[in-house]
Amino acid sequence: MCAVDFSSTSMSPEDQAIAERIAELKKELGEDLLILGHHYQRDSIVMHADFLGDSFMLSQKAADSEAKYIIFCGGHFMAESADILTSPDQVVMLPNIRAGCSMADMATLVDVEQAWDEMLSSTDLKDPIHRDNPASVAEEGESYLVPVTYMNSSADLKDFV
């Protein structure tokens, strides 16, 4: 659980009303609701979080949860990761669809596919996807280009890998 003390945090009457409504909904939904807050979120958001952490830890919390509704207060790639790791009957929501991450936005799928094709065409490396078993160990003398991605990447890049 989030262990930050927000008792001294002052709020406007409007923010106080929103906070009270969120608390009511959390009480009403109980264990069916999980709110995840990334470290960089402001106090008025993370004060409602069940867990506060980095993108990897929070995605693990989503994967381990049986909550029906998971609200991910973080960047879009974080909610995508949580959605990939949760079951089909769980709903992962991102409160602000514009919540981005400059690192996640550095490479688009089009850019990566173009770079991939250029690396394959300019080297002797092969694409492992064309092997009978792409996960098997390469035979002696074979060299393959192996894609790797970082947690802070969009779901379409993770799918490419």
Enumerate the predicted regions with their spans.
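Active-site loop-to-helix "anion-binding N-cap" substructures in soluble metabolic enzymes
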Residues: M1-V161
